[in-house]
Amino acid sequence: MSLTEGLFFKSLYEENKVTLLFLHGGGGAGWMWQPVVDRLTEFHCLVADLPEHGGSMQVKPFSMKLAALKAAELIREQAHGGKAIVIGLSEGAQVAVQMLADYPAVMEKAVISSALLLPMPGASMYSSRGLISALFKMSVPPFRNSDWWIRLNMKHAAGIPDAFYPQFKAGFQEMTESQFVNLMVANQTFRMPEGIEHANVPALIVCGSHEYKAMKDSARSLSSKLKCNQFFQINLGQGSGLANEHNWAMTAPQAFADTIRNWLSGQPLPGVLS
């Protein structure tokens, strides 16, 4: 484990030449990537905690710009050759998109899974920090010790398997009002960053086939902006839904790892992608 002036991170399998940087979803931390990283032992894996998350709580306030800056600094300092393949999911994918606009020189390639770039229905409320603060006060402090509420959110909102309940519960119990507000505002108001069309970074863009229309349209819009990319939708089969496709790094880690490995080596992608 290491702590730079910026982000807390873990550096695994450092003997391998190619560096992957993993950027997690909002409200979680680097632990979310464990099932995938355990299957990619042939790569040097950097697993970061984003600003105002996990071990990087002191790096704040969270914003896409700040997160992109700190992730780029981490790559320059820790990645082999000062460049990495950046893999982002959900809010981490939004950070990767911001990096494509601001710091493409540190990115060999990018895997962008479910980056929201367009307004969701009712998104206007997220411009009001006061409303989000009220939402926090109603939905978090009264339930900090409520296992059923935490499990409900973990499974149906976040798509996180039961094995990671201790980590999810700890994050829920430690969440602050400012963290919640900053994350929600950043996530829901993020739009296509200026200058991204100039990024000459090969990208794999994915989203779930059961995700919201705004998410699918965001992926298509990003694909239309980038010079060199492939766009796929995820379908995890019968019983699949929004949450488990959105967080497929945890619900289908073998498929996620195989997607990374096969895309980087030019092999056919797993059948869950079409």
Language-model segment annotations:
Residues L46-I87, N244-M250:
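Active-site loop/oxyanion-hole signature of alpha/beta-hydrolase fold enzymes
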Residues N229-S274:
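Catalytic active-site module of serine/aspartate enzymes centered on a nucleophile-bearing elbow/loop
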Residues G88-G92, A96:
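Gly/Ala-rich beta-loop-alpha elbow adjacent to hydrolase catalytic centers
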Residues A101, K109-S139:
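Flexible "cap/lid" loop of the alpha/beta hydrolase fold
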Residues L7-M57:
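Conserved HGGG/HGGXW glycine-rich cap/lid loop of the alpha/beta-hydrolase fold
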Residues Y212-S218:
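Conserved alpha/beta-hydrolase "acid-adjacent" motif
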Residues P121-A123, P141-E197:
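Conserved alpha/beta-hydrolase catalytic His-Asp/Glu region
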Residues A199, I205-C207:
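Short beta-strand/loop motif that positions the catalytic acidic residue
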